[in-house]
Structures are given as structure tokens and as C-alpha cells.
Amino acid sequence: MISKIETETQSRMEKCTESFESQIKKIRTGRASPSILDSIQVEYYGASTPLRQLANIVAEDSSHLAVTVFDRNLTPYIEKAIQNSPLGLNPSSAANLIRVPLPPLTEDRRKELIKVIRSEAEAARVAVRNIRASVNKKSKETLKKKEISEDEDRQIQDNVQKLTDRYIKKIDEFLTKKEKEVMTV
């Protein structure tokens, strides 16, 4: 019973951490990263399709992305989707290659991004703590029903606390790494 609870808890905390990391990877840093364009949906023939399914995206250098379109006919649709995105990018195309220059981040924009990153990190920490509280509550309920002993309850709480500490540390490490990326000029 204890290992089942711990495995389930670890799985839930891992999902929270992965979700946080995927959200943060979308935030633009000073360097070109293909994941910046992950959220872009391309409208063509009445359907909305993720850009990644229609093109290959690579970082040419620290300030340019190259989008190689699989089907030449989609180039104007993809270019329009990138222009209309909230990222404020201005692509230029030639045949089936779209170059996306990334303008340097201003100091104010960097500070804004750090605030966003920190709030996302705090939300992830709260989610992990809520999972801990939920598991501790379930553990207390099963103790009241006499399904587990007090020692087992204590062991569950200790192990869940260790998991909580580990995942919060992981979130903090990722936060620190991302803050450094954003502040690097």
C-alpha cells in the first residue's frame, strides 16, 4: 500500500514538474530556440495545425531560426501565422525556407519575463504542495479507518515530504537556470 501511494504521488509530482518545464521552455530567452515557435498554430484550408507538423525548425545562430517547410504551398500560411503570433516576430521567406530573426530583448522585457517565470515556478511549487497535502489527508483517513498503522502513516508522510522537497528543488533549479538564460545578453 505504501509503495503504491508513493509511486502515484511521484507520478503526479513528476507531471507537475514536466508541465512547468514545458511552459517555461516556451518563454523566449536571449538565444534562438526552436521551442519558441511550439505554440504557433497554422490555419490553412480551414484547419488549425501545429507548426511542428508542417515544418522543421532549427536555430541557425543565436538570433535566427530557420523554418524549413515540408510543402512549398504552405509557406505563406506559415509566414502569416508567425507574423500574427503574440511573439512579435517578423519572418522572411524564400521558397520553402523561412528565416525568423529574433530581436534582442530589452532590459524591461527581461524583467517582465523573469516575473512570469517566477510566478509559473510558484504555481508549480503550490501544485506540488497541494499533492502532498492531498496524500497526507488520504493517509490520515486510512489511519482513522484502521487500514494502516500509525508507523505506516508516519512513513508515508516522511516519504511524501522527501518527494515534495526533491521536486520543489528540481523546480527551483530549473527556475534559476531559466533566469540566467533570460538575463544573459
UniProtKB/Swiss-Prot annotation:
The keyword Protein biosynthesis applies. It is found in: Cytoplasm. One of its GO terms (biological process) is cytoplasmic translational termination. Keywords: Cytoplasm, Protein biosynthesis. Responsible for the release of ribosomes from messenger RNA at the termination of protein biosynthesis. May increase the efficiency of translation by recycling ribosomes from one round of translation to another. Belongs to the RRF family. This is Ribosome-recycling factor. It comes from Hamiltonella defensa subsp. Acyrthosiphon pisum (strain 5AT).
